[in-house]
């Protein structure tokens, strides 16, 4: 199973990706985690990424795709993967499709977790208190939701046109949402 998990901040992508990893016995690949690991390892891509981030700039699609290509070449992804945090825009979706086609591992499905904006803000506010996440302050949350709406939401249409999209209600208990994802994937 080769899967992309989409959804706005606070929709439960990371939580459900971790649960799907255990359910399907395939790795959960987070581009944020990849970036941090490459920087920590001091790899050539990590050095480039660190320089970019030190300037306060966003890491380029080229660097992210290079990291993804290296990760997808590892043995543990032979039976599939769950990709979380990428693609974030249509250009990245096209690049990902090209990469996966090149390595002979096209996506099986893209799951979009749907959660109302008001509930997202509540969830994120609760997470900020519980985890002390600096990027979960109200102003940052509004900005992240707007960025998602402007940049990432068009990715939904991209995959819908290709017949890969499954929309799942992301509201409910962790088990309820996991069950809905399984049903959407025909499992």
Curated annotation (Swiss-Prot):
Pathway: Purine metabolism; AMP biosynthesis via salvage pathway; AMP from ADP: step 1/1. AMP binds at residues 31, 36, 57-59, 85-88, 92, 133, 144. It is found in: Cytoplasm. It catalyses: AMP + ATP = 2 ADP. One of its GO terms (cellular component) is cytoplasm. It is an enzyme of class 2 (transferase). CDD domains: ADK. Its main location: cytoplasm. The keyword Kinase applies. Residues 126-136 are annotated as: LID. Pfam families: ADK (PF00406). GO terms for biological process: AMP salvage. Signal peptide: none annotated. Residues 30-59 are annotated as: NMP. Keywords: ATP-binding, Cytoplasm, Kinase, Nucleotide biosynthesis, Nucleotide-binding, Transferase. Its EC number is 2.7.4.3. One of its GO terms (molecular function) is ATP binding. ATP binds at residues 10-15, 127, 172. PROSITE patterns: ADENYLATE_KINASE. Consists of three domains, a large central CORE domain and two small peripheral domains, NMPbind and LID, which undergo movements during catalysis. The LID domain closes over the site of phosphoryl transfer upon ATP binding. Assembling and dissambling the active center during each catalytic cycle provides an effective means to prevent ATP hydrolysis. Monomer. Catalyzes the reversible transfer of the terminal phosphate group between ATP and AMP. Plays an important role in cellular energy homeostasis and in adenine nucleotide metabolism. Belongs to the adenylate kinase family. This is Adenylate kinase. It comes from Xanthomonas campestris pv. campestris (strain B100). The lineage of its organism: Bacteria, Pseudomonadati, Pseudomonadota, Gammaproteobacteria, Lysobacterales.
């Amino acid at each position: 199973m080769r899967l992309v998990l989409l959804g706005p901040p606070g929709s439960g992508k990371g939580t459900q990706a971790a649960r799907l990893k255990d359910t399907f016995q395939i790795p959960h690949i987070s581009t944020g985690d990849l970036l941090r690991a490459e920087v920590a390892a001091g790899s050539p891509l990590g050095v480039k990424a660190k320089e970019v981030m030190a300037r306060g700039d966003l890491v380029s699609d080229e660097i992210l795709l290079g990291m993804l290509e290296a990760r997808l070449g590892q043995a543990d992804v032979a039976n599939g993967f769950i990709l979380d945090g990428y693609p974030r825009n249509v250009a990245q979706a096209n690049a990902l499709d090209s990469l996966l086609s090149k390595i002979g591992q096209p996506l099986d499905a893209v799951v979009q977790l749907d959660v109302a904006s008001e509930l997202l803000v509540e969830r994120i506010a609760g997470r900020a208190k519980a985890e002390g996440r600096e990027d979960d302050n109200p102003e940052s949350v509004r900005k992240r939701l707007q960025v998602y709406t402007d940049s990432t939401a068009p990715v939904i249409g991209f995959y819908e046109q290709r017949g890969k999209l499954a929309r799942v209600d992301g509201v409910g208990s962790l088990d309820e949402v996991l069950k809905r994802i399984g049903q959407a994937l025909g499992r």
